[in-house]
Amino acid sequence: MKPLSLLIEILIILGVTIKTIKAEEHNKRQKERNVTTQVSVNEIKQYLSHILEQRTSSNVINKRENLLEKKKNQRKIRIKGIQNKDILKRNKNHLQKQAEKNFTDEGDQLFKMGIKVLQQSKSQKQKEEAYLLFAKAADMGNLKAMEKMADALLFGNFGVQNITAAIQLYESLAKEGSCKAQNALGFLSSYGIGMEYDQAKALIYYTFGSAGGNMMSQMILGYRYLSGINVLQNCEVALSYYKKVADYIADTFEKSEGVPVEKVRLTERPENLSSNSEILDWDIYQYYKFLAERGDVQIQVSLGQLHLIGRKGLDQDYYKALHYFLKAAKAGSANAMAFIGKMYLEGNAAVPQNNATAFKYFSMAASKGNAIGLHGLGLLYFHGKGVPLNYAEALKYFQKAAEKGWPDAQFQLGFMYYSGSGIWKDYKLAFKYFYLASQSGQPLAIYYLAKMYATGTGVVRSCRTAVELYKGVCELGHWAEKFLTAYFAYKDGDIDSSLVQYALLAEMGYEVAQSNSAFILESKKANILEKEKMYPMALLLWNRAAIQGNAFARVKIGDYHYYGYGTKKDYQTAATHYSIAANKYHNAQAMFNLAYMYEHGLGITKDIHLARRLYDMAAQTSPDAHIPVLFAVMKLETTHLLRDILFFNFTTRWNWLKLDNTIGPHWDLFVIGLIVPGLILLLRNHHG
């Protein structure tokens, strides 16, 4: 495995060396941007041979020194002229084991240092330093470091994306039993990225990955069995896979509050991603900071919350969060007081864990009727932190906070009734409060609802409902952080890196990632797949997103069949998908497309009246459809009128007047050309 880790070191060196050359080809506004670098096999071999020669000569010298040392020890370990071979052998084994232990310990230390640097990194340069530490640890045989390096090469985490090198490293790791490597190889096989497209092989890799405890593999298999992707659809099997992951996620949420991740849809604002509402624009953030420093209490609390959990693309920063909360609390904000209490209750880098201080701030907020403060006091009494354990007091505060609509308090009430903590068990009330909290996205409430549906506790058992709920919990795992890195990679123009990350999330069953992957593939800007494979793969992903309820994806499937993208032209199938999007999701674009097909009899029986009705429905559904519908209806009415005038009782006698023959099959475009100038003149006269 050492040659592979050496290869990684070489890639890093080459990536840093030629970074500036490649950066000039990118957008001038992006400074010091890392780019994907492909290193030729010959260059790699040359560097490898050079380093290996140095190491070989070094090994020869070491062997000679060891031999001399061995002879010296042999002379010492003699009893009355007879060599004690047993003592020598034991000594040799001990020294060898000690050397191996020291070597392993050093690799572990380097890996831990790399993790620490990576967690604290604020710039690309610092991240590269972390991966250099991982490379050194990998060279010492640290499997976790090798996994990190393989991921970095696959996703382009430190500026160099080399899928071929990543695959080589994953294959070596898989032989060592790495379930993470097996999951990665399954993913690459399922898309045909750098490997042969092979769904059967992908399924085998995922199965081995899942057996080894890899939660991504378990999620992927859960989604496949839920949807029947290359396996027989089986809800119970899907339930077993999703439950394993959901149990882990719920356990982490019980210990500490998770950080929600914004899932930006590339399909919504492809022309102006920087203004996407899911990510806070830097200029807007600076403006908010200005307002906060000027004393805007509401903005102070909002910025404090964003920094407390790291939302809208901002880094989690406890010091900044505390700074804004203290300012707002000084101005009398009950929310700010409650959040300060929460920080002291949990403890973090900015404040030490202190139950007494938490109680103080929660009490201040609760005295103002604040739901977060009331819930905080309930938690202190429920767990007996800083106050005597008192379930009755906890119940009282949770009820007050729940009445004000605080979802965490609603969950706590549900949990008390579910577990019988200080009160009689009541599954109906537990279900009621879990359901209320779940409507606000409270993750633990969703988890316990899934548990109740899976076991039939307090409700009629429903495997499908349980799986859907467990799936929602699983999608809150730390792997969802790739949504942000994928988005920023796309925004920076690193399409291949973005696609690989979205594609992995899509494989795990995230609908947003499926849509985003299909959107990128459709643009044909990626280089990691052959161009002829992009439309078929995009169609597959649009279909998976549509099955999960995405109306835009359903319209896209109709478009692909209408135009023959990635499949044969099929007007009938296109009309079917447009009809589903129009009737089930009330999608204006689908209504418009379906109306056009009825107007021209494409794949369905021609029906002018139904076409007119669908055009009207599209206009009523979406204001954006008003102008297109206006032109479409004017064209429809005009052509219909012209046909009545020109062809009524004159078809045989005046055959030469047929518009299809005189102007051509696209004569309706000619008619539109006549209508538009007339409409413009009418509008001018009207305003004049």
From Swiss-Prot:
Glycosylation sites: N34
Subcellular location(s) of the protein: Membrane; Cell projection, Cilium; Nucleus speckle
Range of residues in the leader sequence: 1-23
Sel1-like repeat copies, ranges: 107-142, 143-178, 179-214, 215-250, 297-333, 334-370, 371-406, 407-442, 443-478, 551-586, 588-623
Membrane topology: Single-pass type I membrane protein
Positions on the Extracellular side per record topology: 24-662
Classification via Pfam families: Sel1
Listed transmembrane segments: 663-683
CC terms in the record's Gene Ontology section: cilium; endoplasmic reticulum membrane; nuclear speck
Designated name of the protein: Protein sel-1 homolog 2
The organism of origin for this protein: Homo sapiens
